[in-house]
Amino acid sequence: MELRSQEVRTLAPENDPLKMGMGWKVDDLSKPQILVESTFGDSHPGSAHLDQFVREAVQAVNENGGKAARYFATDMCDGIAQGHDGINYSLPHRDAIVNLVEAQANASVYDGGVFIASCDKSVPAMLMSIGRLKDMSAIVVTGGVMEAHTLPKEYVVNDPACAINELLTLEQIGKFDAWEKTGVIPNSQLDYYKHNACPSCGACSFMGTASTMQIMAEALGLMLPGTALMPATAPELKQAAYDAGKQLMELVKKGITAKDIVTKKSFENAIMVHAAISGSTNATMHLPAVAHEFGIEIDADTFDRMHRGAHYLLNIRPSGDWPAQYFYYAGGVPRVMEEIKSMLHLDVMTVTGKTLGENLEELKKNGFYEHCDAILAEKTAGFARPVSREDIIHSFDNAKGTDGSIAILKGNLAPEGCVIKHTACPKNMFEATLRAKPYDSEEECISAVLHGEVKPGDAIFIRYEGPRGSGMPEMFYTGEAICADPKLASSVALITDGRFSGASRGPVIGHVSPEAAVGGPIALVEPDDLIQIDVHNRKLAIVGVKGEPKTPEEMDAILAERRANWKPKAPKYTKGLLKLYSQHAVSPMKGAYME
């Protein structure tokens, strides 16, 4: 076992005394040095509790022949940053965390790492960091998912979009806020929902980006089986953190590094799982960015290809009925993988030191599924009818859908592509021709929606919100305002070069590429252009002007004339992180990472 940490001790005589100044003992200096990196901090519920898992991992490393060192790269919260310019930092700060972790790991030189995170950008950041440090042994621990709040009868509302109205989760707050603004519910009722939507720490309890990326970490083989998206309050999660630290030491001793585990096949497995869970559209950026760090090239088109014909199984919000905490009760990632086993590469290596196929067989033998069934029965004992795991994770033969959940659309409006989560889109909008109503900021657009200026049959555009424009913030509130209006929810499309929250529902199309800031066709859209959406044929195109259809050749000529008159906007940012990101970010179709 060759240790890089021991090589540098001979190069810098100050190395040993500086570590002993932190309380290290002489015999600690010759042990494998292990980085325990987390996003712990008081920034949001997904990170505020991570210190307990750090302690467990540190203890496990120290008790199993290593010496652990804690490092922190606290992340921001998309939810807390919503509604103001803070949301522009969301995607750029993913890359900022990666750069910080790279510096921390390489400046001191570690032999392995335990990486602990929970949420939208922090989990992808840790996965990207592992890719950048791929010659090191690595394992991931995620902070689990928060509880849902059980509503008293007087606060239960009959929402036809959800069959389980008694359980409150955070992604519903945007809709309730829109209802309060339009007089559907009183302010006191909104306050109750706001004060009870996050009853514990953990990632938000729906299949948004945080939950999706926790699952992706396990699907890539970087987590212990069955430990992704556990309830944050479950005692098993602390045990999982300890077990991860212990297993990391086994990987170090055997010389198994991250690059031995994560391969092209691993990413293909993750994308198949993504299809089965109807995962967040943001994964179409994050997984290519992670793959890039590993020297593996995948892009959004890979998702489209692999989602076609894939079985979609998960009945979890926002594309289903149940809060995300029930995912673990129904068997978690192993149950999903067991159902789609015929579609997976079972020979890939994982952090257990065994293959995925061996892990799945072992779980069946050690009572994992019986344990989950018992917890599900306990957690749903007071419900009106018995709840089975098939209510939450459907079987392969009884899938909710058989065409995955993500589609990449292309056409003269998005030559490089754009993304739609079709499992959250009304079927009548799969083929539609709408009138364009473009806005150059979300603030203008949401005001128009709330003041009744948007009508059925409109295609709303929010542009100059891509990576090079403003850092690619979420367009969450506009989407929720549309979904909260019954007249608009299935008759209006929202199209943007920005992105959406993993909680977004409805006919929302994001990541339009090339983006407006670099002169993409979305910058050329004018009011009353005719916009064709065709999900089945993967098409998004401008097919007419001023309400009149045009031939493809006529549209090419019209767009060429508009392009000749288009002038780029001045850079929005002139200093700091947002300037760096907007200058160096690649297309969302490739991962929106900085190059």
Where in this protein do the model-derived segments appear?
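Catalytic or ion-coupling anion/metal-binding cores of large enzyme and transporter domains
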Residues: 1-46, 53-73, 79, 85-90, ...
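Well-ordered mid-protein domain cores that form the structural environment of catalytic cofactors
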Residues: 90-94, 98
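A short, small-residue-rich loop immediately preceding and capping a beta-strand
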Residues: 105-126, 138-142
